[in-house]
Regions:
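Structured surface interface patches that mediate subunit assembly and partner/cofactor docking
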Residues: 1-13, 64-77, 95-100, 104, ...
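An N-terminal domain-cap segment
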Residues: 2-46, 50
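Alpha-helical transition-metal enzyme core signature, strongest for iron centers
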Residues: 15-22, 45-59, 79-93, 99, ...
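Helix-loop segments that flank and shape redox-cofactor active sites
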Residues: 23-44, 65, 69, 115-133
Length: 187
């Protein structure tokens, strides 16, 4: 369901609100706290925020339909194909920035990105590492990724998460993806 409020895509603001919730639990951490490992593959807080930032950037440049997306996708595939880890590739994009500076860079970018997605045609097809998807699905996927990776941060900090109604975007994309898996595999 595409929700347009005041000619803007609501899913973009739901993404931003999810990011803001994550930012609020991290904004008072010290530099060394970002090296704390999570239960997800031992990723540190730096790894998680760097991952979210890099793939937000990827989704955002896919809106432009230009060479920037192609160059990014080719770089990612080349790095991962040559044995680099996901985190190693992502650190080349974030230029090794860590801690509160990385958190600030992530927030500034997702805030600006929200506005670009909010005014984009929700049905426009954008590139991704797999099949193309709609703008609405792209920003919903970024929301889902943020929500999912945030859980490892909440768990590591010993915090209980309070989910908001915006979780419906994640439920919808999960349901659509589930059906899509059967379609792709012809089952």
């Amino acid at each position: 369901m595409v929700e347009i409020i005041d000619n803007k895509l609501q899913q973009a603001y739901d993404f931003r609100d999810e990011c803001n919730a994550v930012h609020s639990i991290l904004e008072n951490l010290k530099e060394q706290d970002y090296e704390m490992p999570t239960q997800f593959k031992g990723w540190t807080f730096n790894n998680v925020i760097g991952h979210l930032h890099v793939w937000n950037y990827a989704a955002d440049i896919s809106l432009k339909d230009g060479d920037e997306w192609k160059n990014f996708a080719n770089s990612a595939m080349q790095a991962l194909g040559s044995g680099s880890s996901m985190n190693e590739f992502e650190q080349t994009i974030t230029k090794g920035i860590k801690g509160p500076e990385l958190l600030s860079m992530w927030k500034e970018y997702y805030t600006d990105m929200t506005e670009r997605f909010a005014v984009a045609d929700p049905k426009k097809r954008v590139k991704w590492m797999g099949p193309d998807m709609s703008v609405r699905s792209s920003i919903s996927a970024r929301h889902m990724e943020t929500w999912a990776h945030a859980q490892e941060l909440y768990d590591s900090l010993g915090l209980d998460r309070i989910n908001e109604d915006r979780i419906k975007n994640i439920v919808i994309i999960g349901n659509n993806t589930f059906k899509w898996c059967f379609t792709v595999h012809k089952k």
